[in-house]
């Protein structure tokens, strides 16, 4: 039950960050999740909070995937 709540909170947080980044630049937000190149680690004009939020959203997504994999294995 606690794991479900954690995953829901992480998903909502990632969605909010993605929506905040959607309008900031063509390389950010949810547009990078639809099969195009993920431009987090490429040189772009994004600096400061935008780049930090992009990296945080990417890491949050990886953490959620790992939690689901470990939960299914055990």
Swiss-Prot record:
MF GO annotations: protein-transporting ATPase activity
Originating species: Ureaplasma parvum serovar 3 (strain ATCC 700970)
Protein family per UniProt: Belongs to the SecG family.
Gene: secG
GO terms classed as biological process: protein secretion
Top-level lineage group: Bacteria
Protein name (database record): Probable protein-export membrane protein SecG
Compartment(s): Cell membrane
Job of this protein: Involved in protein export. Participates in an early event of protein translocation.
A GO-annotated cellular component: plasma membrane
Taxonomic lineage from the root: Bacteria, Bacillati, Mycoplasmatota, Mycoplasmoidales, Mycoplasmoidaceae
Membrane topology reported for the UniProt record: Multi-pass membrane protein
Membrane-crossing residue ranges in chain numbering: 1-21, 50-70
Alphabetical list of InterPro entries matching this protein: SecG (IPR004692)
Keyword terms of this UniProt record: Cell membrane, Membrane, Protein transport, Translocation, Transmembrane, Transmembrane helix, Transport
């Amino acid at each position: 039950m606690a794991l479900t709540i954690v995953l829901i909170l992480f998903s909502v947080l990632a969605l909010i960050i993605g929506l905040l980044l959607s309008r900031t630049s063509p390389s950010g937000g949810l547009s990078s999740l639809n099969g195009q190149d993920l431009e987090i680690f490429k040189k772009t004009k994004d600096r400061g909070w935008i780049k930090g939020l992009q990296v945080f959203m990417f890491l949050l997504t990886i953490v959620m995937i790992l939690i689901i994999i470990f939960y299914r294995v055990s």
